[in-house]
């Protein structure tokens, strides 16, 4: 499964306002172990997700379910993280996310839809581009979170995916931050053991990428390694 944002461009708009998220699309790859150039792919528009709500910021698979840490915007315009779950077989059979359920922190049960936003607040801030991993030996979940306007990158930790989550704990402050620092991801495949994890982030320049040439250190992943005791 590959979950993608569907973005609508408005290239005549103001800088940082020239695009918006309008949907989510699921790509099912039938032969994921083959060379990506030979992938057989099925594209499924899901009709779910926008700038204020998204369900696939971070993923965790526990057969047959996929757990999602998404984001939603509360009344104060702050993004909160929420937990959702869907059965992978039902997603394939229905070609939709109709089976998606949301974890209610108050009742400690999964609901078919979000009613009162505050009841589903897993932690804050929630992000559009974070990441989730589980360290089996240490028996702990780690989820990235960040404030894109401050340049601060942090992590949340929990023994259970439904919480309680502890943090945010600051792990890095981008020394080259100008406008935004974001897309804070964990890359488990780049770590040989659980003594450290490899992460990446992206930083934006103050120039308009539609018209101006920018330094190559911007809009390129930068990598960090964090040791874990």
Question: Could you describe each region identified by the protein language model?
Answer:
Residues 1:
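Blade-loop segments of beta-propeller domains
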Residues 5-50, 63-127, 133-177, 192-194, ...:
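Beta-rich carbohydrate-recognition and catalytic domains
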Residues 184, 194-196:
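Extracellular glycan/ECM-engagement signal in secreted proteins
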Residues 55-59, 128-131, 180-188:
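Beta-propeller and closely related beta-sheet repeat lectin domains
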